[in-house]
């Protein structure tokens, strides 16, 4: 990295393919696979329906950097399930393959720095918003390049827009205790219809659901 367009391989059914590359520019990257012929972000085939979860992250750290055991990676995806026998595409948003209320709850100590790598592997924009705190965007990149080496790109935010195929490295400090959310701020992405289970209406809720 940085890379050029079209650095992909085609794997036929039943084939295996082994590849290697030099870890170049430090940053947050991901790999993906699709059987689709639809064109999506950066002119690449668009993952759709059953292949929307075929991706993974890889992080290139600067030479000599010690591993950070507290660092977390979050991959945003959209599961387009049109396997049902109707003409509707059923879209569910997810982080690391899970949709609320099944997403992982993270617990941190007050005053300790938190470091996240966030990857938008979906085909839609996601303005990612953190409740209660500002966070520092240390880099903002895409599948070809990352701005991790440029200090001029570092800035504070409460919401950072990630276009399809974009990534960011962020850090923040939980200065006050509480239960805080990190979510996409696109309204219809946080509607109950986007979740993997039926969310009860307010008048149907039991106190233990809150």
Identify the role of each PLM range:
Residues 1-210:
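Copper-binding active sites and cupredoxin-like electron-transfer domains
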């Amino acid at each position: 990295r940085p890379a050029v367009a079209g650095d992909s391989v085609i794997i036929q059914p039943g084939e295996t393919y082994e590849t290697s590359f030099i870890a170049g520019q430090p940053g947050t990257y991901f790999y993906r696979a699709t059987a689709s012929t639809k064109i999506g972000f950066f002119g690449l085939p668009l993952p759709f329906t059953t292949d929307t979860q075929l991706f993974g992250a890889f992080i290139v750290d600067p030479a000599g950097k010690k591993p950070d055991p507290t660092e977390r990676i979050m991959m945003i995806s959209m599961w387009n399930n049109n396997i049902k026998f109707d003409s509707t595409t059923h879209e569910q948003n997810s982080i690391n393959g899970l949709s609320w209320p099944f997403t992982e709850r993270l617990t941190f100590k007050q005053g300790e720095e938190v470091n996240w790598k966030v990857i938008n592997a979906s085909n839609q924009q996601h303005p990612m918003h953190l409740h209660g705190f500002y966070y520092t965007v240390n880099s903002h990149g895409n599948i070809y390049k990352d701005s991790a080496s440029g200090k001029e790109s570092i800035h504070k935010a409460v919401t950072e827009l990630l276009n399809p195929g974009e990534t960011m490295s962020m850090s923040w400090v939980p200065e006050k205790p509480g239960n805080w959310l990190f979510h996409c701020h696109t309204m219809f992405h946080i509607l109950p219809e986007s979740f993997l289970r039926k969310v009860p209406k307010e008048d149907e809720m039991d106190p233990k659901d809150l």
